[in-house]
Amino acid sequence: MDVNEFDFNLPESLIAQTPLQDRTASRLLTLNKHTGEIKHTNFKSIIDYLNTGDTLVLNDTKVMPARLFGVKEDTGAKIEMLMLTEHDNGWEVLIKPAKRVTIGTRISFGEGKIVAICVEELDQGGRIMQLNYEGILQERLDELGLMPLPPYIKETLEDQSRYQTVYARATGSAAAPTAGLHFTESLLEDIKAKGINIAYITLHVGLGTFRPVSVDDVESHKMHSEYYEMSEETAKLLNDTRDSGNRIITVGTTSTRTLETIADDSGHFTAQSGWTDIFIYPGYSFKAVDAMITNFHLPKSTLVMLVSSLATKEFIMNAYNEAVNEKYRFFSFGDAMFIY
């Protein structure tokens, strides 16, 4: 399967640079994968598409303010570091400019409040860094770090909390699970009041989010591993939903990938944690997910491929072209799509 089959023309003016004042004010494109019907509405109306007994699955990961600007201790050269994932031997990071950082390089942030030492070189600007810091790392990041906004967002984010979901709890992501940005606490309460269950999983969004597909053949692409967790409570709720014949609806590609990683062939779950590099593209047979809320993604990205596998590639690409014609807002701060 050729990567170019997932390409589409996107005017730069449709890439949302700032979040809307009201999280629920986004537009919503609904796609009925059974009838082929497409409708245009607003995100507040998502509740009308959810049925009593359905379970909505949210990713409660929290974005770290993990973008740091420092200097090399020996030369004073400026370095940008994006922290991604904690490993046994240090933190996996992205470095700019990577050529300045080799094994043994020391980088100082905040006049030594954090010192990072390179212990391993990875490809594409990746490094493993050991961190030395005063006190608690999260406090130092809150003091020195910035939100790691995607490269297509050029404007400064005035309110850092707008790149977090209102239910973010488990710190560890390098990017927000953006489909969840549309929800407010009030909307979630209204959803629960209708008899719809809310379940939480955790998947820490990592390096794969920042890596484009660099191969021509879709099947040759290798996903980066990301850490996930599912609790006993969530596993039971999802199993009860499955056994009662109700729908499991994921909010975002991260929740989708987590559920499809954990589900057995019967679509049931067990509590667990681990690392997933699952790559979902057309031809994949879903075990667990019946419907999904998601944003509009980058051309030729693994996320467009995942979305195309829940419906059909032709249906999704037609919907994307319609969204462009209707001037929907794209990417992290953009509008949403519901595939059911």
Swiss-Prot record:
Keywords: Cytoplasm, Queuosine biosynthesis, S-adenosyl-L-methionine, Transferase. It comes from the Bacteria. Disulfide bonds: none annotated. It is found in: Cytoplasm. Pathway: tRNA modification; tRNA-queuosine biosynthesis. The keyword S-adenosyl-L-methionine applies. Its EC number is 2.4.99.17. Pfam families: Queuosine_synth. One of its GO terms (molecular function) is S-adenosylmethionine:tRNA ribosyltransferase-isomerase activity. InterPro entries: QueA (IPR003699), QueA_dom1 (IPR042118), QueA_dom2 (IPR042119), QueA_sf (IPR036100). SUPFAM superfamilies: QueA-like. Transfers and isomerizes the ribose moiety from AdoMet to the 7-aminomethyl group of 7-deazaguanine (preQ1-tRNA) to give epoxyqueuosine (oQ-tRNA). Monomer. Belongs to the QueA family. This is S-adenosylmethionine:tRNA ribosyltransferase-isomerase. It comes from Macrococcus caseolyticus (strain JCSC5402).
